[in-house]
């Protein structure tokens, strides 16, 4: 369960960071 969450977070967090800061 945790490894799955970590995998999702690893993909979602950079995408959110990209959208918020507009630094991709």
Curated annotation (Swiss-Prot):
Annotated compartments:
Secreted
Major subcellular site:
secreted
Q: Which UniProt keywords apply?
A: Amphibian defense peptide, Antibiotic, Antimicrobial, Cytolysis, Disulfide bond, Hemolysis, Secreted
InterPro entries, per database record: Antimicrobial_frog_1 (IPR012520)
Q: Which domain of life is it from?
A: Eukaryota
Sorted alphabetically, the Gene Ontology cellular component annotations on this record are: extracellular region
Q: In which tissues is it expressed?
A: Expressed by the skin glands.
Gene Ontology BP annotations: defense response to bacterium; killing of cells of another organism
| Pfam families, sorted | Antimicrobial_1
Per the UniProt entry, the disulfide pairs are 18-24
Q: Which family does it belong to?
A: Belongs to the frog skin active peptide (FSAP) family. Brevinin subfamily.
Q: What does this protein do?
A: Shows antibacterial activity against representative Gram-negative and Gram-positive bacterial species, and a very high hemolytic activity.
Name this polypeptide is given? Brevinin-1
């Amino acid at each position: 369960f945790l490894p799955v969450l970590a995998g999702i977070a690893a993909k979602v967090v950079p995408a959110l960071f990209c959208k918020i800061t507009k630094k991709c």
